[in-house]
Amino acid sequence: MKLKRFVSLLLCAVLSLSLLTACGDTDDVITIAVPNDTTNEARALLLLEELGYITLKDGAGITATVGDIEDNPYGIEFNEVEAAQLPNVLQDVDYAIINSNYAIEAGLNPVEDSLAMEGSSSAYSNVLVVKEGNEDTDAIKALQAALESQQVADYIASTYDGAVASTVDNPGDGYDDTIDYDALAGTTITVAASPTPHAEILAVAKEILAEKDITLDIIEFTDYVQPNNVVESGEVDANYFQHIPYLDDFNEQNGTHLVAVSAIRVEPMGLYGGKQSSLDAITE
């Protein structure tokens, strides 16, 4: 009886130790929150691949999802979250990969606060978008000229300290010589945008257009869907919030007819620490 009791106690102790070890392993799993829309999720995963933490399947490219991860040597657990909500879940995960506009909006400085950033790439330049067929209207050309101005380029450089960079090669004076601005006087151009930095940049263009008695009505949205829907429906003239890979994917998925008019600036995506303060925890 004593032997059986000893064996039982020994088995219980081993089982308890195993359970504790398992719990400890669970606690050691690194969680990284990434955007759940196709193109931004791909950007996040490509950044992690560049850093050496995962390997993606050949050809996954700019439409990669977590299902395209071929090798995950550090056992990272991925949480797919709406891009705008990533700053809100940062405290609940080890890391989050966040678009610069949402990081800035949440009070984060992409240059100072991120642990890693993707390189600037024109593939992800944010663009002015209109419905197909409206690209060459004087109103849109006037808005484009204002956004491609030296005033906007200077504002971006002085305001965002490298977190946002202008992609306009030869900024102008804000006006298009081919437009009859007198004919546009008294008109209103409507544009949908996310608050930061898009609406802020548009505010500079608004001042430029106001010099010609043109009103720029900036309508703010906090999601990535409605700004495209209102341009497709004709409720709004243009939008300014997205990059071309996202636009192409949106058109394909929704049957919309939206086109990019001009690339204005790029925002490198950043990897931010939540529960962790350095990247060392991933490989430890």
Question: Where are the regions a protein language model picked out?
Answer:
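C-terminal motif of bacterial Sec signal peptides marking the signal peptidase cleavage site
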Residues: S18-A22
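Short, well-ordered beta-strand elements
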Residues: D28-A33, L184-T196, I214-E220, E284
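Ligand-binding "clamshell"
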Residues: D92, E105-M117, D249-V261
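Short helix-initiation/N-cap motifs at beta->coil->alpha
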Residues: A60-N88, I218-N229
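Periplasmic-binding protein-like
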Residues: A44-L45, E49, A139, L147-V168
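Beta->alpha turn/N-cap motifs
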Residues: E82-A83, Q91-D94, I98-I104, P195-T196, ...
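Extracytoplasmic "Venus flytrap"
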Residues: D37-E41, A183-A205, Y224-Q226
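A bilobed periplasmic-binding-protein/Venus flytrap-type ligand-binding module shared by bacterial periplasmic
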Residues: Y124-A142, P268-A281
